[in-house]
């Protein structure tokens, strides 16, 4: 795999009470805590659920009263906690989060431990103990950090090969074999999860209005969605570069998307291999397939980079570079932010400030949601990107000591000012179960392109007013918020905010003592899905045997379940039958799917070969 050596081939604990009668425990003792003196014993152990309940009662009983209202005091707090990264032009405002100085002091030991853990992670320690892996996405934007010279060389050579390949595609040096345009005009990216969300966010944020190649995504196993993307390409399928992204090559959704696209190529009389690119781990199923079939190029994925942090690897960089986005600037922005977030001073570390505010606002147990509101159309997908980064990293059943903690932080959002006409009504006046994060972009348009709709007011001024007005209206009703401000949306600033949140997630995971870098729940879902498909094959076998009888023997759900030796799966069997019936793959002899008790089904035809398989 030439490209893997750098060449592309052209063949929890709880928040302390505001009255300080309740003190947070260290991370190793989160399953109990002590009450102040009452008529009952002082050291009363509670279950985690009880602890969560008490923490919410103590922390938020007078939350509105505790938030500063005096303008002078608020301005002083704003200045005291205002953070600026001058080189990146990034500001962080946490003045509308009501943490206390005592809380910051109590969190200091945890953060110092988190900073040390992050330092060890960057040096190559096993930061993902459940899978025995290093975690190296920070090395991707500063290869000098890589713990081995071979990794440093691999990172640098891969970046060079991505840029060279992209230049050759854009310039037309590498051409599709059958395109009348004589060059590639479209990208079809096939991947799911981090292999899709990262490239989608970057494309939406940074692609020029008229990119050298336009990009489309197949990010699901929905047949109608796949058909739509292929149909939209139309005759341009002949000039489409298909980028297939899968670490193993065995991810069902990505494999299905690939097979569907290959079918479309065959039906159009096109040679898929001459237009296919694989981004995968060396010697994976996908890598071997691409090598044997002679795909256009192959680029590496690494076992030390997870999907949700892969945006600075070939996963995110290749699609971006093909759209004419300056990926080296994106890496520079990320590297600058990485440097800013290595300081061990909480007050001077923007990622630590975010993690601290998340902990305060959600009691360290995810008791409140994080609503992400980017006031810029091009950043619309940032909330979806953060949804995976935060929730897949922090949503864990067990901590690093094996205790059941059910940690997490729910993330959702929309763009401003669309949110003004959607759910801000509930955020301000409804249930108080969230804190907000505003993403502000100062520059509205490129220099020289702005104009006034009315004297002294531009279109962008209205957007600015909506953001600031919403922030003020929420705070006036006791709703806490964080504001992240960048000068403009550029590859550098996008790289910076990605790196900011990656580091914040890692630090937060450390202070609540969980592994941010594995996803056992996702794997459990994949296993359960595989079991459903295995059951479906048994159902089809039973139905085929009954259909091949003379006369045909329609079966009830109970009979199917019995012959599958799975009476406990009768509900799932019904769902399988209903789905297959809707797609004309089983026929109903009696009843209908709306009446499960009476239904009898059989197949449309007997497959004799399957009887003897």
From Swiss-Prot:
The keyword Phosphoprotein applies. This is Glucose-6-phosphate isomerase 1, chloroplastic. Residues 1-21 are annotated as: Disordered. The gene is PGI1. Its EC number is 5.3.1.9. It comes from Arabidopsis thaliana. The modification Phosphoserine is found at residue 595. Keywords: Chloroplast, Gluconeogenesis, Glycolysis, Isomerase, Phosphoprotein, Plastid, Transit peptide. Its main location: plastid. Gene3D superfamilies: Glucose-6-phosphate isomerase like protein, domain 1. Residues 1-48 form a transit peptide.
């Amino acid at each position: 795999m030439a490209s893997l050596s750098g060449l592309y081939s052209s063949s929890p604990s709880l928040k302390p009470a505001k009255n300080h009668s309740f003190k947070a425990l260290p991370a190793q003792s989160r399953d109990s805590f002590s009450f102040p003196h009452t008529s009952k014993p002082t050291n009363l152990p509670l279950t985690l659920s009880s602890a969560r309940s008490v923490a919410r009662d103590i922390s938020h009983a007078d939350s509105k009263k505790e938030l500063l209202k005096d303008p002078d005091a608020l301005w002083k707090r704003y200045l005291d906690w205002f953070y600026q990264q001058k080189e990146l032009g990034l500001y962080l405002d946490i003045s509308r989060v009501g943490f206390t100085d005592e809380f910051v002091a109590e969190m200091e030991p945890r953060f110092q431990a988190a900073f040390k853990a992050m330092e060890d992670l960057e040096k190559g320690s096993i930061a993902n103990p459940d899978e025995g892996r290093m975690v190296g996405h920070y090395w991707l934007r500063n290869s000098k950090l890589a713990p081995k010279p071979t990794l440093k060389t691999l990172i640098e050579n891969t970046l060079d090969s991505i840029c060279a390949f992209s230049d050759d595609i854009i310039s037309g040096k590498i051409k599709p074999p059958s395109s009348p345009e004589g060059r590639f005009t479209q990208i079809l990216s096939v991947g799911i999860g981090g292999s899709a969300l990262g490239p989608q966010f970057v494309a939406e944020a940074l692609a020029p209005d008229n990119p050298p190649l336009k990009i489309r995504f197949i990010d699901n196993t929905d047949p109608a969605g796949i058909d739509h993307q292929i149909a939209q390409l139309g005759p341009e399928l002949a000039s489409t570069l298909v980028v297939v992204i899968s670490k193993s090559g065995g991810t069902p959704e990505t494999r299905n998307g690939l097979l569907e696209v290959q079918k479309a190529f065959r039906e159009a009389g096109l040679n898929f291999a001459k237009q296919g690119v694989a981004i995968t781990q060396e010697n994976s199923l996908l890598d071997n397939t691409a090598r044997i079939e002679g795909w256009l190029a192959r680029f590496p994925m690494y076992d030390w980079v997870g999907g949700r942090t892969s945006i600075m690897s070939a996963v995110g960089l290749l699609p971006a570079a093909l759209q004419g986005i300056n990926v080296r600037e994106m890496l520079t922005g990320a590297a600058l932010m990485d440097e800013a977030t290595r300081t061990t001073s909480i007050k001077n570390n923007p990622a630590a400030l975010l993690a601290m505010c998340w902990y305060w606002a959600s009691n360290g147990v995810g008791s409140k949601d994080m609503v992400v509101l980017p006031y810029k159309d091009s950043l619309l997908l940032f909330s979806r990107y953060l949804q995976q980064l935060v929730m897949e990293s922090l949503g864990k059943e067990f901590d690093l000591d094996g205790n059941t903690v059910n940690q997490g932080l729910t993330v959702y959002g929309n763009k401003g000012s669309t949110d003004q006409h959607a759910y801000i009504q509930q955020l301000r006046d409804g249930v108080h179960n969230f804190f907000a994060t505003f993403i502000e972009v100062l520059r509205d348009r490129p220099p020289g392109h702005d104009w006034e709709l009315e004297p002294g007011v531009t279109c962008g001024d209205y957007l600015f007013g909506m953001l600031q007005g919403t922030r003020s209206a929420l705070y006036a009703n006791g709703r806490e918020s964080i504001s992240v401000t960048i000068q403009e949306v550029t590859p550098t600033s996008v790289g910076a905010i990605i790196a900011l949140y990656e580091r914040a997630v890692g630090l937060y995971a450390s202070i609540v003592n969980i592994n941010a870098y594995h996803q056992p729940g996702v794997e459990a879902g994949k296993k359960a899905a595989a079991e459903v498909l295995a059951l479906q094959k048994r159902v089809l076998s039973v139905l085929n045997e009954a259909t091949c009888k003379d006369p045909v023997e329609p079966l009830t759900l109970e009979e199917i379940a019995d012959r599958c030796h799975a009476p406990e799966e009768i509900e799932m069997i019904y769902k399988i039958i209903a789905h297959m019936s809707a797609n004309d793959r089983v026929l109903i002899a009696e009843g209908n799917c709306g009446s499960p008790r009476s239904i009898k089904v059989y197949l449309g035809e007997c497959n004799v070969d399957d009887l003897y398989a």
